[in-house]
Each structure stands twice: as C-alpha cells, then as structure tokens.
From Swiss-Prot:
ZRF1-UBD, as annotated region: 160-250
Main location class: nucleus
Modified-residue entries (Phosphoserine), positions: 47, 49, 60, 63, 183
Gene Ontology BP annotations: 'de novo' cotranslational protein folding; DNA replication; negative regulation of cell growth; negative regulation of DNA biosynthetic process; positive regulation of DNA-templated transcription; regulation of translational fidelity
Description of how the protein assembles with itself and partners: Component of ribosome-associated complex (RAC), a heterodimer composed of Hsp70/DnaK-type chaperone HSPA14 and Hsp40/DnaJ-type chaperone DNAJC2. Interacts (via ZRF1-UBD region) with ID1.
Protein's cellular compartments: Nucleus; Cytoplasm, Cytosol
GO CC annotation: cytoplasm; cytosol; nucleolus; nucleus
Function, in words: Acts both as a chaperone in the cytosol and as a chromatin regulator in the nucleus. When cytosolic, acts as a molecular chaperone: component of the ribosome-associated complex (RAC), a complex involved in folding or maintaining nascent polypeptides in a folding-competent state. In the RAC complex, stimulates the ATPase activity of the ribosome-associated pool of Hsp70-type chaperones HSPA14 that bind to the nascent polypeptide chain.
Chain segments carrying region Disordered: 287-312, 426-453
Pfam families: DnaJ, Myb_DNA-binding, RAC_head, ZUO1-like_ZHD
N-acetylmethionine modification, residue list: 1
Domain writeup: The ZRF1-UBD region specifically recognizes and binds H2AK119ub. The ZRF1-UBD region is also involved in protein-protein interactions with other proteins, suggesting that it may be masked by some regulator, thereby preventing its association with H2AK119ub.
UniProt name for this protein: DnaJ homolog subfamily C member 2
Length: 621
C-alpha cells in the first residue's frame, strides 16, 4: 500500500470510506505533484527536508523575480545593431544594476518584459516607424539575450565586463588606510576565483594563520577569467579549414597574452598589499623577537651547560688533585717509614760497629805487638765498612760469649773472607779495565802513542771536559783536547782524534766498568786528602760512586731559577745569597754559592780552551 504525506496548508484531504462490497484487483498508475516530488528525491538521493529547501529556494527566486525592477536603458533606441558586440548586454535588458549576479530566471523575465515593450509588431501597431530586417534596435535586445542565456557566452562577456574596475592601488595610497583601500579591491576580484569560500582580508586583529592563508590563496590564485569575447576574428567567418585554424591560432595567442597580463595584475595587487600590510610587519617583529628570545635561551642553555661542564671539570681536577695528594702523602709516608727504618738500621749497625771496636779493644786487638795491633785495627775498620748488620751481630755474639782464642779465630776467619772477597772484586775490575783498554785500542785502530796509557786521572779529566764542553761548542773536540793538555798531570799530549776515540770507548763500557773507574778515582781522592772512613757514614750495602760535591744534582728548572735569581739580586744586594737561596726551593745558601763557583770555573775553562784553539789556528795560518 502506498503511503502519501499529509496535505499542505490550504489543501484538503479526502477520506474515502471502505465499501462493504468485495475487493477487486485493479491497476493504478501514480500521478500528481506528490509522486513527482517522490521521484525527484529518489533520483537525487535526497531526503524530504532537502526537497523542501529546494522548493523554498525556487519560491524565493520567484519572489525576487517579482520584486526585481528593471532599469530603462536611455540609449537603447540609438544602438547600432551591427555593433552589438560592443554594447552592454545587461544594460540593454535593464539588468545594469544587477549584472553578473542576475539569475537565469531574472534574465529570462527581463527579456520577456523587453520583448513585450519593444517588439517591432507592437511598435508598428502603435504607429512608430520600424526599420526593416536586422537594422532595427530590437536586434540588440535579441543579441543581448542570446549572449546572457548561454552560460559559456555569458562567462566570456562577464570576463570583460566594461563596468569592472581593473585598477590596482599603489603602495602610497594604502600607507594610512590599508584595510579601507584594499578590502573592496580583493572583494571585487574574488568573483574570478574558481574556488568558493574566498578568504577575506580581515583586520588588524586577524591571526597569523588567517593572514597566511589569505596571502597563500591569492599568491596561488586560480582564475576562471578568459578573454575569448575580445577575439578580433570569428572563426565562423572563415572560408576554409586552413583559414579557420589560422584564426583559432591567432585567437589563442591573444587570449594567452591577455591571461598573462591578468595574472600579472593579480600578482601586483597581492605584492602591493603584502608590502603595505601592517600585520606582516607586526608578525615579522614578533618573529624576530621570538628568534631573539630563542637565541638568548639557547645562549643561556649553552652557558649553563658550559658552567656545568666547567664545574664537572673542576670537580674532576679536584678529585685528581686529592688523589695525587693522597698518593704523594702515601709515598711520603713510605719514604718517611723507609727513612726511619734506615735510621734504625744505621743506628743498629753503628752500635754493632762500636761494639765490635770495643770488643777488640777489650781483648787488646788480640796482639801484644804494637805493629800487629795497628794492622788489626785497620782490619777491624775494614770489617766495619764491609760487613752487614747480620754478620756484625753474629761476630759480636761470638766475641762476647767466647774466650780470647775462639774470638780471635772467628775474627781472623771473617777478615780472611772479606779480604778474599775484595781480592776477587779487584781481579774482576782489573780484567774489565784490560778488556776496555783492548776495545779502545781496537776502536781507535792503534793510531799513535797518544791513544795509549790513559791513567785514571786522565779518564776523570776527560769525563769532566766532556761534561764541561757539551755538544754544540765550536771545535768541541779540539777544545777538550787542549783543556786536557793544560790540566793533565801525565804530560801526554792528546789530539782531538785521541779524545774522540777514548770518549767512544768509554761510552761502550758496561755499568760495572764505570763503577770500577769511579771507585778507583774515589780511592785516590781519599789517599790524597786523607779522608778517614767513618763508622756511621754509609749504609751496610752502599758502594762508592765517586766524588760528588752535591748529594742531589741540579735540575734544569733549578738552574733556570738560580740564573734568574742572580739577575734579580745583583752583587750590592744585602744578604744576597740568602735571598737567592729562597728563590731556589730545595737549595741552601751553600749549595747556591758552590754551584755559582762551579759555573764560573766552567765559563773560565771554556774561554781559556777556546782562546787556545783560536791562537793555535792563527799560528798555523
């Protein structure tokens, strides 16, 4: 069963009562306005409410058509039908005040009104003169309707609407009243857009997103405006196909040129607006301020990061310093402990040595003869120098707990062992010296008598001269040879070649041979200066390393500090050497004076040797 909606206002609904007779089968075809509305909704896939809106829209258009008042075109009767293309079609139909906003219904109604008023038959009946054929001005009305009733032709005419203002405001015009100048311009140019919902220019309170969307739209403006209406040649008038193609080509080129000019006009409009827009300036200033703020924030972050890194570095340095101080303190404590142990050992060995001397003295050195006692005293001193603490303690225990004969036997046995050890050491040293001499003779090739018979004094003098004249001295080896010839007590004259050969042979010596040379030099020094061995002057395991004035050699840094102090405090300075000693940490006044004297002697020796070399070279010339 088909259910129809209720009737609208002003319409009635007829109710048919059911008959009591039997029902019969019949065919019914749907008709009427309700069925028409149903078919429209089904074809458009729309609801009832949509159809109601469509009906209301049609009713509103009809009411607007009824309210539309046509404007009489005063120049209508003077128009030339042959020049219909240059006429204003909207004005001819009385729609000059509506123009492109006029609907097709309005155009049709306006044409109907103009036909009823200006048709030649009606005017002829009224007694007005009529021109024959297409020469009558009514032809202009017909042409106007033909152009405006066709959507394609109407768009072509709208594109070149003679009343449209194509002007573009200059920058100077919009400096003070930007929105008042540019808002109507963009409003009227928005009619050419293919896209609907054209964004508005807005005002000073518009957001950045709205302004950016506005200029993005207009910089990418998609215009439907075309200029086919201005074609100078009509292809319909062509006599052949080639002529028609040529006309089409000319028209396309002209349209493209005008389209390009139109897009340039739009671009100029947008550029002028963008350059004058106060919002753009405001946004740029805000962006600049934002960047400056971000820059300051980054700089502050970098500064804090740098401070954190510096703080961490200082903490690490402090930790390293504390660790180093702790390590140095541990080393110092160990050194102090070792020193204490060494002092204890020195005291113990000193005590044992004194005990050994007293024990031997109590036994009258185990001899009644004066010469034997002196010899025994020397042997006892030798034992004190050579024996270690354990051996001394063992020997003292024997002497304290035994008789004279047993003590003498133990003492003599210990003396024999020490003498045997010294004899072996001397033999080994002599063997090394002989081997060193042979190697030196081989290295020098046995040249000259000057390369032989190097005494211990000459060797020590050579070592001293090599240290005195370092590498880089002019004619170094000649200077060293002259220095040795002046200061040597052997009387042997040495040449530069002899000195070089011996220096090379000394460099090849092993450490034991160097120790032997130093030991012999020190033994000779003791004999010459009468230095008696002291019981507490050396540790049990110490060996003689040769004569040394300072216990600690001077470092390069100490030498620089001494030289600077000598320059800072001249000779006339009161308490000069005390101040110099204060400027050199770790050195006493005596150390500084002794080092100064050594430097003076070295400088004098260098000058003397160099003068001799210079004099010898002059004599040879």
């Amino acid at each position: 069963m088909l259910l129809l909606p209720s009737a609208a206002e002003g319409q009635g609904t007829a109710i048919t009562h059911a008959l009591t007779s039997a029902s019969a089968v019949c065919q019914v075809e749907p008709v009427g306005r309700w069925f028409e509305a149903f078919v429209k909704r089904r074809n458009r896939n729309a609801s009832t409410s949509f159809q109601e809106l469509e009906d209301k829209k049609e009713l509103s258009e009809e009411s607007e058509d009824e309210e539309l008042q046509l404007e009489e075109f005063p120049m209508l009767k003077t128009l030339d039908p042959k020049d219909w293309k240059n006429q204003d079609h909207y004005a001819v139909l009385g729609l000059g005040h509506v123009r492109y906003k006029a609907t097709q219904r309005q155009i049709k109604a306006a044409h109907k009104t103009m036909v009823l008023k200006h048709h030649p038959d009606k005017r002829k009946a009224a007694g007005e003169p009529i021109k024959e054929g297409d020469n009558d001005y009514f032809t202009c009305i017909t042409k106007a309707y033909e152009m405006l009733s066709d959507p394609v032709k109407r768009r072509a005419f709208n594109s070149v609407d003679p009343t449209f203002d194509n002007s573009v405001p200059s920058k100077s015009e919009a400096k003070e009243n930007f929105f008042q100048v540019f808002s109507p311009v963009f409003e009227r140019n928005s009619r050419w857009s293919n896209k609907k919902n054209v964004p508005k220019l807005g005002d000073m309170n518009s957001s950045f997103e709205d302004v950016d969307a506005f200029y993005s739209f207009w910089y990418n403006f998609d215009s439907w405006r075309e200029f086919s209406y201005l074609d100078e040649e009509e292809k319909e008038k062509a006599e052949c196909r080639d002529e028609r193609k040529w006309i089409e080509k000319q028209n396309r080129a002209t349209r493209a040129q005008r389209k390009k000019e139109e897009m340039n006009r739009i671009r100029t409009l947008v550029d002028n607006a963008y350059s004058c827009d106060p919002r753009i300036k405001k946004f740029k200033e805000e962006g600049k301020a934002k960047k400056e703020a971000e820059k300051r924030a980054k700089a502050e972050a970098r500064r804090k990061e740098q401070e954190a890194k510096e703080k961490q570095r200082q903490a690490e340095l402090e930790a390293v310093r504390l660790a180093k101080e702790k390590e140095e303190e541990e080393v110092r404590q160990q050194a102090l402990l070792a020193k204490k142990e060494k002092e204890i050992q020195k005291k113990a060995i000193k005590k044992e040595r004194q005990k050994l001397r007293n024990s031997c003295k109590n036994w009258n050195h185990f001899s009644d003869n004066e010469a034997d006692r002196v010899k025994m005293m020397e042997e006892v001193e030798k034992l004190c120098d050579r024996l270690e603490l354990a051996s001394l303690q063992c020997l003292n225990e024997i002497l304290a707990s035994s008789t004279r004969e047993v003590g003498k036997a133990a003492l003599e046995k210990q003396i024999e062992e020490v003498n045997e050890l010294m004899r072996k050491e001397k033999e080994e040293a002599d063997a090394r010296m002989r081997q060193a001499s042979k190697n030196a003779e081989k290295s020098t090739g046995g040249s000259g008598s000057g390369s032989k018979n190097w005494s211990e004094d000459d060797l020590q003098l050579l070592i001293k001269a090599v240290n005195l004249f370092p590498a880089g001295t002019n004619s170094r080896w000649e200077v060293i040879a002259n220095y040795m010839n002046i200061h040597s007590s052997s009387g042997v004259k040495r040449t530069a070649k002899d000195v070089i050969g011996k220096a090379k042979s000394l460099q090849k010596l092993d450490p034991h041979q160097k120790d032997d040379i130093n030991k012999k030099a020190f033994d000779k020094f003791k004999k010459e200066h009468g230095v008696a061995p002291q019981a507490d002057s050396a540790a049990p395991s110490e060996r003689f390393e040769g004569p040394c004035i300072d216990s600690i050699p001077w470092t390069t840094e100490e030498q620089k500090l001494l030289e600077q102090a000598l320059k800072t405090y001249p000779v006339n300075t009161p308490e000069r050497w005390e101040k110099i000693a204060e400027a050199v940490p770790g050195r006493t006044k005596k150390d500084c004076m002794r080092r100064y004297k050594e430097l003076v002697e070295m400088v004098k020796a260098k000058k003397a040797a160099q003068e001799q070399v210079l004099n010898a070279s002059r004599a040879r010339k």
